[in-house]
Regions:
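A cross-family phosphate/adenosyl-ligand binding-site feature
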Residues: 1-211
C-alpha cells in the first residue's frame, strides 16, 4: 500500500464525487482526516479552499490526502461549476454561511455552493465558530434560512467556549446519509428491543419473549 492509499471501510460513498469545501476556521487543520475518511468509504474528492483556509492548512497537504484536484483560486477551468453528488463544507465559518445565503460569489467555493443550490445537489455544512458567534441571533436566522432552502447543517458540541466541528467519522456518516437518502433502492430496517407482539385478530396476538 502506498502512503497516499487508504484502507476501505465501506462502500456507502462508492462512485460519488464530492466537493470538499474548506473555509478559514481553525478546524481546517482536521481536513486531512476528513478527506481520508471520505475516501475510505469510496468517495472521489475535489477540494475547494478559501484564501483564509490556505493560511491554516496547505493545498499540498490536501493534495496528498485526497489524490484529487485542489481549487485554490479563480482559473479558466472553472472546475467548481462541475456537477457534484454533494458539496460538503467543513469547517464552515459564519462568513461562508452568510455569504452563501445571500448569493455572494466572492470565491470559487461560494460559486460552487451557488451552483449546487441551482442544480439541487445536496449541500452539507459543518460549522465551527466561537460560541458567542454561534449563539448570536443572526447566526440562527442564517442557519434557519439555509435549512429552509434544503441545506443540511451538522453542529458539534460546545467545548472550551467554541462550537467545534463533529468527529470526522460522524461528518462522513451524515454525508453518506444525505447523499443516499434519495436512493430508490435504499433499505428501511426496523430494530426492535425486548418482547414484540404481532396481532392475529381483534383478541389474539403472537408474542416473543425477547428479540
Amino acid at each position: 500500500m502506498r502512503d497516499t492509499d487508504v484502507a476501505t471501510s465501506g462502500t456507502s460513498l462508492a462512485g460519488k464525487h464530492i466537493l470538499l469545501g474548506i473555509s478559514g476556521g481553525i478546524a481546517a487543520v482536521d481536513s486531512v482526516r476528513i478527506a481520508r475518511e471520505l475516501r475510505r468509504h469510496g468517495a472521489t474528492l475535489t477540494v475547494c479552499m478559501t484564501n483564509s483556509a490556505q493560511n491554516i492548512i496547505t493545498p499540498l497537504a490536501l493534495s496528498w490526502a485526497t489524490q484529487g484536484e485542489i481549487i485554490t483560486d479563480w482559473d479558466g477551468d472553472m472546475s467548481q461549476l462541475s456537477r457534484f453528488d454533494a458539496v460538503l463544507v467543513c469547517p464552515a465559518t459564519r462568513n461562508i454561511l452568510a455569504c452563501h445565503l445571500h448569493g455572494i460569489i466572492s470565491s470559487p467555493l461560494l460559486m460552487a455552493l451557488s451552483a449546487a443550490r441551482g442544480n439541487n445537489s445536496p449541500i452539507i455544512f459543518a460549522p465551527s465558530m466561537h460560541s458567542d458567534l454561534a449563539e448570536d441571533s443572526i447566526t440562527s436566522e442564517i442557519t434557519d434560512s439555509l435549512l429552509a432552502q434544503g441545506a443540511h447543517i451538522i453542529w458539534g458540541v460546545e467545548e472550551e467556549g467554541k462550537r467545534k466541528t463533529v468527529e470526522h467519522t460522524q461528518v462522513v456518516a451524515e454525508t453518506a446519509h444525505v447523499i443516499n437518502s434519495s436512493n430508490e433502492r435504499r433499505k428501511s430496517v426496523v430494530i426492535t428491543l425486548g418482547a414484540t407482539q404481532s396481532p392475529v385478530d381483534d383478541v389474539r396476538y403472537i408474542q416473543n419473549t425477547s428479540s
